[in-house]
């Protein structure tokens, strides 16, 4: 969720502030992953992150690592995080963009005219108004991520499994249904707690998803 926020906030800001010609092109790039299935995108990450994949080839080419000491980026939690961040990133960008688009640019100009530096105007005037989008995007990404199954199962291997994969294992393999039910309860409790925290901090009535 934090990685999606760190990558999605600048992307949404560019979408909201760039000229229409460039923002439309960037929006197409954001929506492009939705034109392919989740399974295809996950399988593509397997090819990209494997030891003989594109990422390791580039790292060897620029001299960060040697050919004999390639990074292990797949079948572990690293691969799961990278693939899930890519898949979930649009769900963070779109709520943020919908909020940022409604913020008048005159607010920043007024802050600058009153003596605020660009950084201070952004932190004190612009960023607080984007909190509903941050909360909505974070809640959406968290709910989607906590129940993800396909991506960790294919990319994560044994060391990159999430709670949904553990529930499936105990339901289908070990037949420890009581543990699976307990894990499901933890899953539900986590979602409800985040929903409660969002309602207390921001207010569910202020949620803006689009």
Per-segment meaning from a language model:
Residues 12-41, 46-51, 201-202:
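Short loop segments and helix-boundary regions at transmembrane helix junctions
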Residues 97-108, 112, 181-210:
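C-terminal transmembrane helix and the adjacent membrane-cytosol boundary/short C-terminal tail
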Residues 15, 32, 110-114, 180:
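Short hydrophobic faces within alpha-helices
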Residues 42-85, 119, 155-159:
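Membrane-interfacial helix termini and adjacent extracytoplasmic/periplasmic loops
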């Amino acid at each position: 969720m934090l990685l999606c926020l760190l990558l999605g906030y600048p992307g949404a800001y560019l979408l909201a502030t760039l000229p229409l010609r460039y923002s439309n092109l960037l929006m197409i790039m954001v929506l492009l992953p939705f034109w392919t299935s989740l399974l295809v995108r996950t399988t593509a990450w397997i090819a990209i992150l494997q030891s003989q994949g594109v990422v390791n080839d580039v790292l060897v080419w620029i001299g960060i690592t040697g050919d004999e000491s390639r990074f292990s980026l797949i079948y572990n939690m690293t691969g799961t995080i990278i693939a899930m961040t890519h898949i979930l990133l649009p769900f963070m960008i779109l709520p943020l963009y919908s909020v940022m688009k409604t913020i008048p640019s005159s607010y920043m100009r007024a802050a600058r005219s009153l003596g605020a530096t660009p950084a201070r105007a952004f932190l004190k005037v612009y960023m607080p108004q984007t909190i509903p989008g941050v909360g909505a995007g974070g809640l959406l990404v968290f709910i989607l991520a906590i129940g993800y199954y396909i991506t960790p199962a294919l990319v994560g291997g044994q060391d990159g499994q999430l709670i949904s994969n553990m529930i499936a294992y105990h339901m289908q393999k070990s037949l420890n249904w009581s543990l699976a039910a307990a894990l499901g309860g933890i899953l539900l409790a986590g979602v409800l707690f985040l929903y409660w925290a969002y309602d207390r901090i921001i207010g569910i009535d202020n949620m803006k998803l689009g």
